[in-house]
Regions:
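The AdoMet/dcAdoMet-binding core of the Class I SAM-like
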Residues: 57-171
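Glycine-rich FAD pyrophosphate-binding loop
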Residues: 103, 280-300
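Helix-loop-beta segment of a Rossmann-like dinucleotide-binding subdomain
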Residues: 122-125, 312-313, 337-346, 371-406, ...
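N-terminal Rossmann-like FAD-binding beta1-loop-alpha1 element of flavoenzymes
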Residues: 259-287
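Dinucleotide-binding Rossmann-like beta1-alpha1 core, especially the glycine-rich loop
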Residues: 303-380
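A conserved short coil-to-beta-strand element within the FAD-binding core of flavoproteins
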Residues: 414-430
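Flavin-dependent oxidoreductases
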Residues: 438, 442-521, 526-537
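C-terminal catalytic lobe of FAD-dependent flavoproteins
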Residues: 534-587
Length: 587
C-alpha cells in the first residue's frame, strides 16, 4: 500500500480555523487578515473565474477538473457551482470535478453564518451542507448529483495532500484556484515544493488564477513550466497573477479520457458498487453474473452489517478504514429500504477490545461515539456489559442492496454467464464464457467475481464463513447490530442471525452442524446470554476472500490492457466496496 502523508496523528483528529467575526464576516487572528471581503462574489469572479476562462470552458467541455488550495468557507466552490449551473449549454451528462484542499475545515454552523451574507448562494450552500459531514480528516468524495458536481475535499496541508495525489493521471487539474493567505504570512502554501506539485498535477490545458502578485509566486510558477502574467488586481489591489501551462509532453490516462463502455464480472457487493460508481461517472456498464440472479453468491446472505473497527494511528490502513466506512454509509443512505442506519454497538470487551475501547473514547468524538454504562446497557439493550455505540452505519440486506445498486439506467445485467477469460480484440477487450457466445467489445474489464479472483491472483487467501439463524430467542431483543468476539444482528422475520466462523481448511460450502453448535456456544459465552437449542437453526455458509496483508485488491492488474480487479475485502466487504468501486471508476 502506498505511503500516505498526513499532517494529522490519526483520521479523527480535528482542526478548525481560529476565527473572529467582524460585521458578520470571518477574520483570522492567526494571519491578521480577513478571509474575504463583503464583495467576495465579484472578487471570486475576477480572480478565479475569468482568468481560468471558466464560463466559456463550461459551455464547451463535458468534463473539467478544478483544483483549489484553500477551501476556506466554501465561497469559491459555491460561486463556481452557481456559474456552472447557469451555463445552459452544458448537458445533463456533464460533470464538474472540483478538488479542494484545506487544513482547517469549517463547521456547518460557520458556513451557514457566512452564507447569510450572500443570499444568491444560499440555495447551493444549503444543498452542499446537506451532504457535508466532515467526521474524519484527509480525503472525502462528496457526490452532489443535484449540481452535477463531484467534490473531492481533502483536509490536510497543501504539500502533503498534493503528494498523495501523485501517480494517478486522472488527478490532473485543468484550472487552479490558489487562495491561501498572503505569501508573507503563509509561506508553507506558497513554497517552491507546493508550486512544483501543482505543476506536476496540471493537465496540458491547465491555467491558474490568484489574488497575489508576489514575486516569489511568479518565479516559482515560471520555474515549473507556467507562462505567468501580472495583470490588474481586483478593487484596491494593484496587481494579481494569472498563468497558463506551457506546451509539454504529458501522459494522459486512456481509460479516464476514452473509456465509454466497460464489463464487470460479478454482481456481488464489489461488482455492484463498481458498476454503480462507473455508471455515475457516465460509463455504460455490462455486468455478468454466473448465477440465475444478481448477487446470488457470497453477497446473498439474508442480512449483514458494516464493521467500524477504526484505528487511532496515522497509518495508511487507518485512513483507508475511516474513509471507506463513512463513504459507504453516505452511499447506502440513498437506499433506505435496503439499508437501516441504526448505528452499531460494541459490548462485552476482552482485553484487546478494552484497549481499543479506551482508544476510541480517548478520541473525544461525541459526534461519532456514544458511551453506555452497564446500567444504561441493561436498560437500553438488556445486555450485561458496558458499551460503545458508533452512531453512523448500520445493517443491510445484501442481495437487495446489490440489486438496487444495479438498477441504474446505464447498467445492464446478464445472468447465467460463466466467465473464462479475456482476450484482445483490436484495441478493445472481449470476453469468453464457457456457456454463452459473446461478441461484445469493451474499453475496460473489471473482475469482481469473489473467489474467482483466485484464477488471476492465486496468492489470495480463502476461508469459509458460517452464519446461524435462530428462531424465538427471548434473550435477544436488540434492534441494532452488536459486536464482540462475533456479532448478533437484529431479528429479521423472527430470525436472529449470529456470526461468524472462520474455517481455513474446508472441502465444500455445506453448513456444518459442529460449527453451528460451536458458534452458538461462543456467542452465549461472549454475550452472556442463553440462545437455547440448536434444533431448527438455519445456517448459511459462504466463501470469504482476503489478502496476505489484509488489504483489499482494487486496481489495474494488466500492464498492456485495461483489466482491473476488485475483491479480497475480507470481513469488511460492505464497508470497503463502495470506496474501492469509486477508486476503480475514477481511473
Amino acid at each position: 500500500m502506498p505511503i500516505h502523508h498526513s499532517v494529522f496523528n490519526h483520521p479523527f483528529e480535528t482542526k478548525q480555523q481560529e476565527i473572529d467575526w467582524i460585521d458578520g464576516l470571518p477574520f483570522s487572528p492567526s494571519y491578521d487578515d480577513r478571509f474575504f471581503q463583503a464583495d467576495a462574489i465579484k472578487e471570486i469572479k475576477d480572480v478565479f473565474i475569468v482568468p481560468n476562462n471558466l464560463e466559456d470552458r463550461f459551455k464547451k467541455s463535458q468534463k473539467i477538473s478544478i483544483g483549489e488550495l484553500g477551501f476556506g468557507f466554501g465561497l469559491n466552490f459555491f460561486v463556481t457551482a452557481m456559474i456552472w449551473n447557469q451555463s445552459k449549454r452544458h448537458s445533463s451528462s456533464a460533470v464538474l470535478n472540483y478538488l479542494s484542499i484545506e487544513e482547517a475545515l469549517p463547521s456547518k454552523e460557520e458556513i451557514s453564518k457566512v452564507l447569510e451574507n450572500f443570499p444568491e448562494l444560499q440555495k447551493i450552500g444549503e444543498y452542499f451542507l446537506s451532504h457535508y459531514l466532515p467526521v474524519h480528516n484527509d480525503m472525502q468524495r462528496i457526490e452532489l448529483p443535484g449540481l452535477n458536481i463531484r467534490l473531492t475535499l481533502i483536509q490536510n496541508n497543501a504539500e502533503l495532500a498534493l503528494q498523495n495525489l501523485l501517480g494517478f493521471s486522472n488527478n490532473l487539474i485543468d484550472a487552479w484556484y490558489l487562495d491561501g493567505f498572503d505569501p508573507a504570512k503563509n509561506l508553507a502554501m506558497w513554497s517552491s515544493s507546493v508550486t512544483q506539485l501543482v505543476a506536476l498535477l496540471s493537465s496540458n490545458q491547465a491555467t491558474f488564477g490568484t489574488f497575489t502578485s508576489a514575486g516569489l509566486v511568479k518565479r516559482n510558477f515560471t520555474k515549473f513550466g507556467y507562462a505567468v502574467s501580472k495583470v490588474k488586481g481586483f478593487g484596491k489591489k494593484r496587481h494579481k497573477l494569472i498563468g497558463k501551462i506551457l506546451p509539454r509532453k504529458h501522459i494522459q490516462n486512456p481509460l479516464s479520457v476514452e473509456c465509454s463502455k466497460i464489463a464487470i464480472i460479478g454482481s456481488g457487493i464489489a461488482g455492484s458498487c463498481t458498476a454503480y460508481a462507473a455508471a455515475n461517472h457516465g460509463l455504460q456498464v455490462d455486468v455478468y453474473e454466473y448465477g440465475q440472479e444478481a448477487a446470488c453468491g457470497t453477497s446473498s446472505n439474508p442480512v449483514a452489517a458494516m464493521y467500524p473497527r477504526f484505528s487511532s494511528n496515522n497509518s495508511s490502513y487507518a485512513h483507508l478504514i475511516a474513509q471507506s466506512y463513512f463513504f459507504a454509509d453516505r452511499l447506502y443512505s440513498n437506499f433506505q429500504n435496503e439499508y437501516k442506519r441504526t448505528g452499531l454497538l460494541f459490548s462485552h470487551f476482552n482485553k484487546y477490545q478494552e484497549d481499543w475501547l479506551q482508544q476510541m473514547i480517548g478520541l473525544d468524538r461525541k459526534d461519532i461515539f456514544q458511551q453506555f454504562t452497564e446500567a444504561e446497557m441493561k436498560k437500553e439493550f438488556n445486555l450485561e456489559s458496558k458499551g460503545l455505540k458508533v452512531l453512523q452505519g448500520g445493517y443491510l440486506f445484501p442481495q437487495a442492496l446489490c440489486q438496487a445498486l444495479l438498477r441504474h439506467e446505464k447498467i445492464k445485467v446478464y445472468i447465467d454467464h460463466c466467465f473464462e477469460n479475456t482476450y484482445k480484440n483490436n484495441l478493445k477487450i472481449s470476453l469468453n464464457f464457457s456457456n454463452q457466445l459473446n461478441s461484445k467489445q469493451y474499453d475496460a474489464v473489471v473482475i469482481a467475481s469473489g473467489a474467482g479472483l483466485l484464477n488471476v491472483i492465486p496468492s489470495l487467501k480463502i476461508s469459509k464463513g458460517q452464519l446461524v439463524g435462530l428462531k424465538d430467542s427471548p434473550d435477544i431483543t436488540c434492534s441494532i447490530p452488536i459486536n464482540s468476539e462475533g456479532y448478533i444482528l437484529p431479528p429479521i422475520d423472527g430470525i436472529t442471525w449470529i456470526g461468524s466462523t472462520h474455517q481455513k481448511d474446508f472441502q465444500d460450502l455445506l453448513p456444518s452442524s459442529e460449527a453451528t453448535k460451536d458458534l452458538i456456544l461462543r456467542t452465549e459465552r461472549n454475550f452472556k446470554i442463553n440462545l437455547g437449542s440448536a434444533d431448527g437453526a438455519l445456517t448459511e455458509a459462504r466463501v470469504r476472500l482476503g489478502s496476505k496483508d489484509r488489504l483489499p485488491i482494487a486496481g489495474k492488474i494488466s500492464n498492456d490492457q485495461h483489466i482491473y480487479a476488485i475483491g479480497a475485502l475480507g470481513s469488511r466487504g460492505f464497508s470497503l466496496a463502495p470506496l474501492m468501486g469509486e477508486l476503480i471508476a475514477s481511473q
